Amino acid sequence: MGEEWSATCANCGYFFFVREGGGFFFHLLHCDKCGKEKTVSFDKLGEVHLRYLKGLKGPYCVASSNHDKEVQKTFQGDPISEEEYFKVVESLVRKCRCGGHYTFSSPPRCPKCHSPDVIKGDMHVNYD
């Protein structure tokens, strides 16, 4: 699932927090140009998310395990791989205002100068 950790920009020295991963019912993508966050609800993804769940070997997470197992048992659509799923999700999200694209793999960036050169700090929280 998701996590949050403190960071300091190696370029400008700005201190900030980075959130990655997402949650029980949404994904968290970042802009590949400025680092801005974008949440994408599983409900808004509709059938493509159900196809992804269908292809998993187990539930997506503990919080949705009953739902996920039911989808895996009863959903009639074809399963989709994680790679295919990520491509579809990224294609459905609008471009960032800065002109960049929201992706699952974008590195954390400083919110002040947008540098990807960040130093991971000691404060860390896992969201499972």
Language-model-detected regions and their locations in the chain:
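Short, surface-exposed linear segments at secondary-structure transitions and domain or protein termini
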Residues: 24-33, 48-54, 112-114
